Every structure is written in structure tokens, then in C-alpha cells.
């Protein structure tokens, strides 16, 4: 079994890696919706915002977050 964390590593109440929002697991919907967003966004300057990169959440044994301090 492979363990891929990277930007998809997130800690929740179950402290699991590999899914962005582990607390929302298995909440599938049977309806299909499409959203179209049309517009112009402002220029994003990375220096003005904190960028999330899964800090403090790394894959350990059995694809669990190590340490779980998110």
C-alpha cells in the first residue's frame, strides 16, 4: 500500500493522511450539480497571504499522520 501525502495530507479527528478533509469521508451525494464562475480575480501576491502546505503533518507508519499536530 502506497502512502501519498504532499498537499493532500490533512489531520482530522481520525488523524489520517491522503485525504484533504478526512472528517468528511464517505459523504457522497447522489445528485450532480455544475457551478460556473465567470469573472476576473485580482492578482494574487503570495507575500500577502500565508500559504498552507501541510506543515506539521507527515505520513508515518500505516499512512497515519506523524505527528498529528495540525
Swiss-Prot record:
Keyword Transport: no
Keywords: Metal-binding, Metal-thiolate cluster
Entry GO MF terms: metal ion binding
InterPro entries in the cross-refs: Metalthion_15p
Highest taxon in the source lineage: Eukaryota
Record family assignment: Belongs to the metallothionein superfamily. Type 15 family.
Stated role: Metallothioneins have a high content of cysteine residues that bind various heavy metals.
Protein name: Metallothionein-like protein 1
